[in-house]
Amino acid sequence: KMTPYSENGSPLILPAKVSKQSYRPAQSNIPNDKQVRVFLKKLVSNYVGKTGVVPPIGIKELREHAVAVLKEARLEGKYENYTAILVSNQAWRDTLAQIPYDRRLLLLPKCLRVEERCPAPFDEFGLLCKECGLCSIQDLSVEAERLGYAVLVAEGSAIVRQMIETGKIEAVVGVSCINVLEKCFPHMEAAAIPGVAIPLLQDDCVNTTVDLDWVWDLIHLTSDDK
C-alpha cells in the first residue's frame, strides 16, 4: 500500500476505520425512529432537572416517573421500561461524572459482534476481542481501556455482582437488552452503585444494534462536562 503524504512531505496519519452498524429496526417496546429516541432523552433530562429526582431510585418510583414523561411526550405506554432506563441514567449522570475512569466498569454484550464472522474466542469472563474491526466492540473497549476502565464483554447479572463485590468498581456503564437490565437492577440498587445503561435496540441476541453516540457520551463523561 502507498503511504499518503501531506503537502509538506510528512506522512499523513489516517484515522482508523470506524465500524458501522447495519441498520435494523428497533424492537416494538423501543421507539424505532432515532429522532423520537433523542426527543425522549431530552424530555427526560428536562424532567429530572425539574423534579429533582435523586438516585438510587426504586423500580416502582422509576416506573411512575416514566409514565409521567411518556404522558408529557404523548407517546405510548409500551415504551415505559425503555423510558424508565433513561430516567435512571439521567438521575445517576452527575454521580457517574465524579467517579474516576479507573473505578468504572464498561460492560458490553457479545451480541454486538457480527456473529457469523467474529473470530474472537471466549473464556470464563466473556469474549476476548481480536480487534478485527468488524463491529463496534473493538472501538468501544479500546477507548475505554485507554481511559482506565475495566472492560468486560459478557452477559448477565452474575458478572456485575462479582465485579461490584471486589470493591474495585464504583460505577458501571453497561450496554444490554432491556430484559438483562431488569435482572441486573436489583443488584445495582442493593449496592447503591451508580449504573447507567444504554439499551440495545433489539433483544434477539444476534447482530444487535445500539445508539453508539450515547455509549461514547457516557464512556467519556466527566465532571468537566458540566
Name every feature range the model reports, one short phrase each:
Residues 163, 182-187, 204-211:
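Short, charged, surface-exposed secondary-structure boundary motifs
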Residues 156-165, 180-181:
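A short, acidic, amphipathic alpha-helical segment used as a generic capping/interface helix at domain edges
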Residues 194-226:
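Ser/Thr/Gly-rich flexible loops in soluble cytosolic domains mediating phosphotransfer, phosphorylation
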Residues 168-169:
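Proline-aspartate-enriched helix->loop->beta-strand connector
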Residues 147, 191-193:
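Short, structured coil segments at secondary-structure junctions
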Residues 1-110:
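Electropositive, gly/pro-rich neighborhoods at or near active sites that engage anionic ligands
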Residues 108-109, 152-156, 173-178:
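Short His-Asn-centered micro-motif
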Residues 96-149:
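Redox- and metal-dependent alpha/beta enzyme cores, enriched for Fe-S-associated oxidoreductases
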